């Protein structure tokens, strides 16, 4: 009956709209941290749909204080049981340093110690130019040399953070913008295959 179909759709739409009120988690109980780079097609690479996960993006896919804020909320109150950290090749956070960016803003007349970083926390201010440089969190300033290292570092930080439940599964991957594929950190298949001129003979 048409009326039964309509009633069923209305119920489905109501449940969808009231997910938070009814305590319904996202479809995969998943939170993803990745870079804001538009070349990272995160849903496609993970094989997920828009309703399957909470997606958090920032410059570099770095575990910042705000990333931790979101991760702690989704895992403690929204039913999330898995976190995936995805960095990517050719990331802009590898191309500059915090010092270069800080100098740019200073040349524009910005005074680091007078910058209000969080409008909701007026007391949270940078106390020195050095802290201003660190605040941008470019890979080099964090002692990180590759997206692989950053993915592993992000996983480690989240696993050891007191606001993230210990039963949450946390893994990291690297998205290759050249191939549009994910891989595990430090597992570069292309480099391995390119070492050999001939394939290995398969033995029976």
UniProtKB/Swiss-Prot annotation:
Cofactor descriptive note: Binds 1 zinc ion per subunit.
Protein's GO biological process: hydrogen sulfide biosynthetic process
Top class in the EC scheme: hydrolase
CDD domains the UniProt entry points to: beta_CA_cladeD
Cofactor: Zn(2+)
Binding-site residues for Zn(2+), renumbered to this chain: 35, 88, 91
Keywords, sorted A to Z: Hydrolase, Metal-binding, Zinc
Stored Pfam families: Pro_CA (PF00484)
KW Ion transport (keyword) present: no
Catalytic activity field: carbon disulfide + 2 H2O = 2 hydrogen sulfide + CO2 + 2 H(+)
Gene3D superfamilies according to UniProt: Carbonic anhydrase
Pathway(s) where this gene product acts: Sulfur metabolism; hydrogen sulfide biosynthesis
EC number per UniProt: 3.13.1.5
The keyword Zinc is assigned to this record: yes
Molecular function via GO: carbonate dehydratase activity; hydrolase activity; identical protein binding; zinc ion binding
Alphabetical list of PANTHER family matching this protein: CARBON DISULFIDE HYDROLASE, CARBONIC ANHYDRASE
Membership in a protein family: Belongs to the beta-class carbonic anhydrase family.
Summary of subunit composition and partner proteins: Forms a hexadecameric catenane homooligomer, through interactions of two interlocked octameric rings. Exists as both octamers and hexadecamers in solution.
Role of this protein: Catalyzes the conversion of carbon disulfide into hydrogen sulfide and carbon dioxide, with carbonyl sulfide as an intermediate. Likely plays a key role in sulfur metabolism that allows Acidianus sp. A1-3 to grow on carbon disulfide as the main carbon and energy source. Does not show carbonic anhydrase activity (hydration of CO(2) to carbonate).
Designated name of the protein: Carbon disulfide hydrolase
Organism: Acidianus sp. (strain A1-3)
Lineage: Archaea, Thermoproteota, Thermoprotei, Sulfolobales, Sulfolobaceae
Name of the gene this protein is made from: csh
């Amino acid at each position: 009956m048409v009326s039964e179909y309509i009633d069923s759709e209305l119920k489905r739409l109501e449940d969808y709209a009231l997910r938070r009120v009814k305590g319904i988690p996202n479809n995969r109980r998943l939170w993803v941290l990745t870079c804001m780079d538009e070349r990272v097609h995160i849903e496609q690479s993970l094989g997920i749909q828009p309703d399957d996960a909470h997606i958090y993006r920032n410059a570099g896919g770095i575990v910042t204080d705000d990333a931790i804020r979101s991760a702690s909320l989704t895992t403690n109150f929204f039913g999330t049981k898995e976190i995936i950290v995805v960095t990517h090749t050719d990331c802009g956070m590898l191309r500059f340093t915090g010092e270069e960016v800080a100098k740019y803003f200073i040349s524009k007349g910005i005074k680091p110690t007078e910058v209000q970083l969080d409008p909701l926390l007026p007391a949270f201010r940078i106390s020195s130019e050095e802290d201003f440089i660190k605040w941008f969190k470019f890979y080099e300033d964090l002692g990180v040399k590759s997206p692989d290292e950053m993915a592993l570092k992000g996983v480690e930080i989240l696993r050891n953070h007191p606001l993230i439940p210990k039963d949450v599964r946390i893994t990291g991957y690297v998205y290759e913008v050249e191939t549009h594929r994910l891989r595990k950190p430090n597992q570069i298949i292309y480099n391995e295959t390119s070492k050999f001129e001939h394939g290995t003979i398969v033995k029976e």
